[in-house]
Amino acid sequence: MEEYHLKCIVTGPPFVGKSSLLLQFCEKEFSFEMDTTIGVEFQTRSILIDSSKIKLEIWDTAGQESFRSITTNYYRGAHIALLCYDITKRQSFQYLSGWMDEVRQMSSPNIVIALIGNKCDCKDKRVITTEEGAKNAKENDILFFETSAKDYESVESVFDGVSKKVLSLIKQGTLTVVNKKPQSIQLGAPTQETPKKPKSECCK
């Protein structure tokens, strides 16, 4: 069985549910009282994709402006970036272009990026339509998912989807696999690996 170690960055504005998304995927847990991420936090989980074992090293980055200079260092060497927004907050969606530019500038050229519209359990508070999210993703040529970290809706689909995309790029020869370690997969030009929120009835 082939085994790949992939580095995944979860990024985007603050309070859109990045930490909750990661907690659900790695621990199958959800909490209405999540501590605000300070800098960068890290978890791992292994999954099986098309008879290949994928070990995901997932970095949860703080969305606050004061941590941006720290968190952007962790984009280097990443194979996957999940760019998250809150479907109930228009401002989080409007800020996406800046975050997208940051990911593309600080990451390798062929990094797999997915746009994640979180909190889709809050249907009565939705202000960003599915069509808007899909259009944004299409214009930027990236993947698109809507999730609920609270209800676990489509959480697995996100990580399965981005992992399958990476594997397809490896098979196409776009990514060169030298060995099994995270820094062994080169996406375009070689890069070096750089070493409480308010309560809500919706997911955080």
Swiss-Prot record:
Keyword line: Cell membrane, GTP-binding, Lipoprotein, Membrane, Nucleotide-binding, Prenylation
Subcellular location: Cell membrane
Protein's UniProt keywords contain GTP-binding: yes
Sequence motif Effector region, residues: 34-42
Topological category with respect to the lipid bilayer: Lipid-anchor
Residues anchoring lipid (S-geranylgeranyl cysteine): C202, C203
CDD domains documented for this protein: Rab
Signal peptide interval: none
Chief place of localization: membrane
Entry keyword Nucleotide-binding: yes
Residues that bind GTP: 12-19, 60-64, 118-121
SUPFAM superfamilies per record: P-loop containing nucleoside triphosphate hydrolases
UniProt GO MF annotations: GTP binding; GTPase activity
Family of the protein in this entry: Belongs to the small GTPase superfamily. Rab family.
Protein name: Ras-related protein RabQ
Naturally occurring in which organism (per UniProt): Dictyostelium discoideum (Social amoeba)
Lineage per the UniProt record: Eukaryota, Amoebozoa, Evosea, Eumycetozoa, Dictyostelia
